[in-house]
Amino acid sequence: MKIPKRLQPLADDGLIDEVLYPLMSGKEADVFVVRCGTTTRCAKIYKEAAKRSFKKAALYNEGRKVRNSRRARAMEKGSKYGRQQQEDTWQNAEVDALYKLSRAGVRVPQPFGCFDGVLLMELITDEEGDVAPRLSEVSMSAEQAREDHALMMQYVVRMLCAGLIHGD
């Protein structure tokens, strides 16, 4: 597959050897399955703010603190620099949350780094190496559903104890 423009710098730097296929496209990012040496990972390319379909971005960012007063003022004013800082803050918050949730014992993809709006992370697969299906595509027994629900509730408790929760 042809390497998308936003992934080309990672390929040039040797972080990605090959783009295998697109995995999904969502309101905030496009995700591709990539090969890094002998390991298969995924690359999440965040969409630029102008191309995202976040209808309530202001609410999403509400309560996120920025310690650097210059950055905070620029973000409040909405200058070009401020918008870039807001993007960087939002992307770094996701990476930080992944590390924090992992330390709390929640099963999340391991991040390998965020490079110019591209998050390189672990691809979660089943025993055969197949990508996990979307929940809407899964059928399971009532017993399996109860077991999975109990596990998810344990993860929610761990997330709350870590001071984080996610709507997805």
Regions found by a protein language model. Give the residues of each.
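AlphaC helix of the protein kinase catalytic domain
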Residues: 129-141
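Catalytic-loop of the protein kinase fold
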Residues: 161-168
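Short C-lobe core helix of eukaryotic-like protein kinase catalytic domains
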Residues: 153-160
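Gly/Ser/Thr-rich active-site loops/lids in small-molecule metabolic enzymes
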Residues: 144
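Conserved ATP-binding subdomain of kinase catalytic cores across diverse folds
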Residues: 1-131, 161
